[in-house]
Amino acid sequence: YLGEEFDIHAGGLDLVFPHHENEIAQSRCAHGTAQMAAFWVHNGYVTVNKQKMSKSLGNFITINEIKKNYNGQVIRLAMLSTHYSQPFDWNNEILESSKKNLDKWYEFYSDKDEEILHENLKFLLDDLNTPLMISNIHELFKKAKSGDKQSATQLSASCKILGLFGENKEDWINFKKVGKEVLNDSGS
């Protein structure tokens, strides 16, 4: 039981009409409320190599299957690279690109808990715009590479707020050396 009104309701884009429209009508009539949920979050469709993911096509893949070849942080970054409301395409390119980005960004890993500046957080406050947040991390990386210490600190803080940098720098480097999953599941 969710109550008469609640904060967030989520579902796939395919459920907006008629399912969610009917759900709203029924809930509002049953409870006499002005709204059912304060926020609606509809995720985009998932494809694999630009084809609809389905068991009948034989291209259905689970996160556990992907984790056999990629660290959980790589998978997380790949997923966050597309806005939740847009279609997401699982493919090797996005996973490899995400791994390469993490390899670069870990150079500026800090185990200190630094407060993230609003200018770096504002993207998440705008409809969880993770692709823009990641674009900003790329900019922070460029500045950090040229010696800007504040950018290095903000890069680390920005990655952490996205649930990245779940391993310490040494563990990530060791992971790179062996080329297979050796990290524990924490932070994945």
PLM regions with names:
Residues 33, 81, 111, 126, ...:
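A structural signal for alpha-helix termini and helix-coil/disorder junctions
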Residues 134-188:
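Basic, alpha-helical terminal appendages of large translation-related enzymes
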Residues 1-114:
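Alpha-helical recognition segments enriched in aromatics with Gly/Pro capping
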Residues 7, 35, 71, 129, ...:
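Poly-acidic low-complexity segments
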Residues 87-90, 94-149:
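Helix-loop elements that line ligand-binding/catalytic pockets
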Residues 62, 73-74, 97, 104, ...:
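Exposed alpha-helical structural elements
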Residues 29, 65-68, 77, 100, ...:
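Charged/polar, solvent-exposed surface patches and flexible loops
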